[in-house]
Amino acid sequence: MVDEATKRTLAAIPLLKTRAGPRDKDQWVGRLKEELVSLIKYVENNKKQDNDWFRLESNKEGTRWFGKCWYVHNLLKYEFDVEFDIPVTYPGTAPEIALPELDGKTAKMYRGGKICLTDHFKPLWARNVPKFGIAHAMALGLGPWLAVEIPDLVEKGIIVHKEKTSSE
């Protein structure tokens, strides 16, 4: 079901061990450290493969994440704000990743710009609790979603590259 490139990407992302969410106070600090190690490794791997496609930061508590993600289509870079909150039931519940500026532009999205991950990603997440974390959500959730949806939205004229809109 998963292609070889995805398997290689997954194998290079460290798995997490601590089963803790924001309500677990001290254990959450440990889980957050594991999350950061995993995210840093994933970003480093992406940079080595010339596949750098997002930046994330969080609030002090590690419960609200935000940043930028981008997708290159026809040699044009499309950049979007990305945000998500860590659910109180995390890691049992995956984060709901949102791209607010795309809200309402595709059927594969919920209100508020939350991308639809129910069919493919959520069952995989459920089988891998607590081993999967934020890096896995980006690699298996947002990355594939961008790869499918952005070219489609561009071809339909729903999103236009920023340089094209400013030069018209």
Curated annotation (Swiss-Prot):
GO BP term, example: reticulophagy
Disulfide bonds: none
GO MF term set: UFM1 conjugating enzyme activity; UFM1 transferase activity
Matching Pfam families: UFC1
Functional description taken from the UniProt entry: E2-like enzyme which forms an intermediate with UFM1 via a thioester linkage.
UniProt record similarity statement: Belongs to the ubiquitin-conjugating enzyme family. UFC1 subfamily.
Protein name: Ubiquitin-fold modifier-conjugating enzyme 1
Organism the protein comes from: Trichoplax adhaerens (Trichoplax reptans)
